[in-house]
């Protein structure tokens, strides 16, 4: 599906209570996660839910926004990305180390949020950003604000003189 013109059939609706029950599990394989998500679909003919469905569901806020902002990624992908994020955002966000998307990432994000319930969002290092709130507007405005902070930081940075030289194997 193209997110620029996605229609309702491309947005698989799930039973949130069924998905949230998965939070109690210690382990869940990718195959079992997909099966559980498909079992929670309101319409069995819908496409598979996103690999990040659990992550959204495990955060308790009413509205959860998530993006892979170029600006945030440009900051977090630095060797000292976690330090830069702490400098930029202070206590407004909590940082989550990189973990492949799926059950383990969802569990990690939920644990990080539980330790920091007053944050406006989560920065997932080398992945993206989540913001949340009790209204869609609050979650959205937090997203715009936090991404803008990263954009301003990048605008102040001096560009690198060159990238490391690489070659394809022969």
Per-region residue spans from a language model:
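Glycine-rich flexible loops
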Residues: 1-170
């Amino acid at each position: 599906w193209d997110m620029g013109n996605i229609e309702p059939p491309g947005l698989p609706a799930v039973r949130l209570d069924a998905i949230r029950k998965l939070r109690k599990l210690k382990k869940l394989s990718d195959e079992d996660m997909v099966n559980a998500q498909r079992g929670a679909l309101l319409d069995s003919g819908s496409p598979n839910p996103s690999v990040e469905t659990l992550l959204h569901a495990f955060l308790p806020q009413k509205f959860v926004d998530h993006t892979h902002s170029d600006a945030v990624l440009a900051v977090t992908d630095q060797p000292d990305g976690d330090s830069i994020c702490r400098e930029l955002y202070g206590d407004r966000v909590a940082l989550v180390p990189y973990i492949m998307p799926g059950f383990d990432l969802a569990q990690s994000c939920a644990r990080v949020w539980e330790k920091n319930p007053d944050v406006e969002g989560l920065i997932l290092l080398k992945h993206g950003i989540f913001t949340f709130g009790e209204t869609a507007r609050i979650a959205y405005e937090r997203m715009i604000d936090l991404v803008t902070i990263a954009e301003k930081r990048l605008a102040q940075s001096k560009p690198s003189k060159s990238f490391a030289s690489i070659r394809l194997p022969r």
